[in-house]
From Swiss-Prot:
One of its GO terms (biological process) is cellulose catabolic process. PANTHER family: ENDO-1,4-BETA-GLUCANASE (PTHR22298). The lineage of its organism: Bacteria, Bacillati, Bacillota, Clostridia, Eubacteriales. GO terms for molecular function: cellulase activity; cellulose binding. The gene is celF. Residues 28-470 are annotated as: Catalytic. It comes from the Bacteria. This is Endoglucanase F. Keywords: Calcium, Carbohydrate metabolism, Cellulose degradation, Glycosidase, Hydrolase, Polysaccharide degradation, Signal. Pfam families: CBM_3, Dockerin_1, Glyco_hydro_9.
Length: 739
């Protein structure tokens, strides 16, 4: 009691520092509905494991499908942490707790904006993973992936090759911080799932209780070692124990959990050199004390907790005890150079939640609400540029994110810019003078992370509650794929009776990135001149001494009546993938030789010789077609021959309710039946694939299916969308279904 009285006396004597005004003022009229929608979508780009068929983008694919195998478990799923591919459960669980807290506070906003199914789906993606990580009451796997190994490679998640060990804590080697945070995440999530899926909510709550007991019993982080240097627990574990017990109280109504939360008060961090509860940092992945104080104030109404959280929010707004967080010249509340915006926007969420509570003084509520809006608007672009990828004016284009960059050579410099739009990602933000450069290699100001977006989503939901906004109907992040597979070639040497060709098979796939061990190419020749000289096919030989592991054939018939043959360059069994300078392409040198003699051999009439130059510089050529299995993915072929039946290697979805059949008068690809095949057809097919287009007329549905099955495999899914896009871009001349 003496401690509390001394605390209140100190509070009565504090000095107040005025909040600075921004030097530059821009319009702050933003579409909070769209921003909320996109900030939620960010988590779909972070997904690890086997992705659902109804995913809302076309550049993420299945990845890390063997996670946990080193310990005989299935630890697939969850989110990659940031721009890397380690699954750090401490910040992941924090992000889940924050997202669930936002739904707890603003469920109506999510319903009204149409975003409730999406945020619940994203939360569940992580909580399903946490369930896998908790195979028994006192065992918890807190990390998958080795930070050093992961950070030493720069490439997309879908083609990772490095070992991904999994790490656990148990009674012998405990980790109270990460276990308690996961308990909080599971408890908070159980609350928001209870109205729609009470059985799943009960499962989450059971895990939350077991995890909390495990964390509270051990009270040690001795076994939490693999994340050191990345996500070390600087604040200790008592803030997480407090946080978790509060969420368990809210989930169960069990007074013992609330009593437990309050019992940790002697262990709460104090402001340096004082007996005051800490107020001068931020609610974040490491420190949950401030959110705990806010919830305790609302739950108990006790003046002690109320004063503690107000000290903290005052420090971030008008100042407290003679000090205040730094502000940039343009008005950003600036705590730290590493991810400055995640702190400011998370504080905006806390300020909004507290200001909306009836127990908050109206004058303070007005200050906190103004602060929250200014910080959110700063992130959205009030100073002239957005800090949210894919939103607003001049948004970041090159966040520090391996999969969004999608390098095929494992080099941060190649390509020059990110190939993908990481929609909704909040970047780290500017420095203390508002300076910011959109640089891929800047992991302090331009990286993104699960914890960055977590409080930001909550703040946006609060802005949507107050100011509204319109989410984009049926929004998806489908991109037009760029060139992924192709062949480069050059003439190494040539003479009267031979030609030596260097050909490079290249995989720069990114929609999504994927390896293939079924790539092959065809080099076409016309031997008419040799035949005219009486030379037979068996007198023409093909040799290859440097082939990168490929099987190089002798001449095979394509159109023998017209003397057209080809060399088959087959890399079957060799995985060519966009993951390094020696992995994304394979070179092959081969020589075609005819009996020596004037006029016995003429390269100029060969289909695949067109456009090739002699020398060391290879050039892209569409006259050497490339195949993935039986599907031609690049280039042209000469007339007269026939290609094998296409067998797409892309995983296909379920059979539609209407079986594709040939319908008279229907043109393949013309899914809107206007007699043309263009981007309008692509958009309509995309709506169908993501299940935002439905048919009430069975006959019209049958016509649509007949036109949409462009790959001819009897199913309508993203494969058809991919093939149709290639046709529209003139990368293929015929649909596989026509071949």
């Amino acid at each position: 009691m003496k401690k509390i009285l001394a605390f209140l006396l100190t509070v009565a004597l504090v000095a107040v520092v005025a909040i600075p005004q921004a030097v530059v003022s821009f319009a702050a009229d933003f579409n909070y509905g769209e921003a909320l929608q996109k900030a939620i979508m960010f988590y779909e780009f972070q997904r690890s494991g086997k992705l659902p068929e109804n995913k809302r983008n076309n550049w993420r694919g299945d990845s890390a499908l063997n996670d946990g195998a080193d310990n005989g478990l299935d630890l697939t799923g969850g989110w990659y942490d940031a721009g890397d591919h380690v699954k750090f459960n401490l910040p992941m669980a924090y992000a889940v707790t924050m997202l669930a807290w936002s739904v707890y506070e603003s469920r109506d906003a999510y319903v009204q904006s149409g975003q409730l199914p999406y945020i619940l789906d994203n939360i569940k993606w992580a909580t399903d993973y946490f369930i896998k990580c908790h195979p028994s009451p006192n065992v918890y796997y807190y990390q998958v992936g080795d930070g050093a190994l992961d950070h030493s490679w720069w490439g997309p998640a879908e083609v990772m090759q490095m070992p991904r060990p999994s790490f656990k804590v148990d009674l012998t080697n405990p980790g109270s911080t990460v276990v308690a945070e996961t308990a909080a995440a599971m408890a908070a999530s159980s609350i928001v799932f209870k109205p729609t899926d009470p059985e799943y909510a009960a499962t989450l709550l059971r895990h939350a209780k077991e995890l909390f007991t495990f964390a509270d019993t051990t009270r040690s982080d001795a076994g939490y070692r693999a994340a050191e240097g990345y996500y070390s627990s600087h604040s200790g574990f008592y803030d997480e124990l407090t946080w978790a017990s509060i969420w368990l109280y809210l989930a169960t109504g069990d007074q013992s959990y609330l009593d437990k939360a309050e019992s940790y008060e002697p262990h709460w961090e104090r402001e340096r050199g004082t007996t005051l509860i800490s107020y001068s940092w931020a609610h974040c992945w490491d420190n949950k004390l401030y959110g705990s104080l806010l919830l305790l104030a609302k739950i108990t109404g006790k003046s002690y907790y109320k004063q503690c959280i107000e000290n903290h929010l005052d420090y971030w707004t008008v100042g407290f005890n003679g000090s205040r967080v730094q502000y940039t010249p343009k008005g950003l509340a600036y705590l730290d150079r590493w991810g400055s915006l995640r702190y400011a926007t998370t504080q905006a969420f806390l300020a909004s939640v507290y200001a909306d509570w009836s127990g908050c003084d109206p004058a303070k509520a007005a200050v906190y609400k103004e602060f929250a809006k200014k910080q959110v608007d700063y992130a959205l672009g009030s100073t002239g540029r957005s800090f949210v990828v894919g939103f607003g004016k001049n948004p970041p284009r090159n966040p520090h994110h391996r999969t969004a960059h999608s390098s095929w050579s494992a080099l941060m410099t190649e390509p020059a810019e990110c190939r993908h739009i990481l929609v909704g990602a909040l970047v780290g933000g500017p420095d203390g003078s508002d300076s910011y450069v959109d640089r891929l290699d800047d992991y302090q100001c331009n990286e993104v992370a699960n914890d960055y977006n977590a409080g930001f989503v909550g703040a946006l939901a609060k802005m949507y509650e107050k100011y509204g906004g319109e989410p984009i109907p049926n929004f998806v992040a489908f991109e037009t794929p760029g060139e992924e597979f192709y062949v480069e070639a050059a003439v190494n040497a040539a003479g009267p009776g031979f030609v030596n060709i260097k050909a490079s098979i290249i995989n720069k796939s990114g929609w999504p990135a994927r390896g293939s061990d079924k790539l092959s190419a065809k080099y076409f020749v016309d031997i008419s001149e040799a035949v005219a000289k009486g030379i037979t096919l068996d007198q023409i030989t093909v040799q290859s001494t440097t082939n990168g592991g490929a099987k190089v054939s002798q001449l095979l018939p394509w159109d023998p009546d017209n003397h057209i043959y080809y060399v088959n360059i087959d890399f079957t069994g060799i995985n060519i993938f966009p993951g390094g300078i020696n992995e994304y392409k394979r070179d092959v040198y081969f020589t075609i030789t005819a009996p020596y003699g004037e006029g016995n051999w003429d390269n100029t009439n060969d289909f695949s010789f067109q456009g090739l130059e002699q020398g060391f510089t290879s050039k892209k050529t569409e006259y050497i077609p490339l195949y993935d299995g039986n599907v031609r993915v690049w280039g042209k072929v000469p007339d007269g021959g026939s290609e094998p039946d296409p067998t797409p290697t892309i995983t296909v979805g379920p059979t539609p309710s209407v079986t594709p059949t040939s319908v008279p008068g229907i043109m393949l690809g013309d899914v809107n039946f206007d007699g043309r095949i263009n981007s309008t057809d692509y958009s309509r097919l995309k709506r169908y694939v993501i299940k935002s287009l439905e048919f009430t007329d069975p006959e019209e549905h049958q016509k649509f299916i007949a036109a949409a099955d462009v790959d001819g495999n009897g199913r309508i899914n993203s494969t058809d969308l991919y093939v149709l896009n290639r046709y529209i871009l003139k990368l293929i001349e015929k649909f596989p279904a026509e071949q």
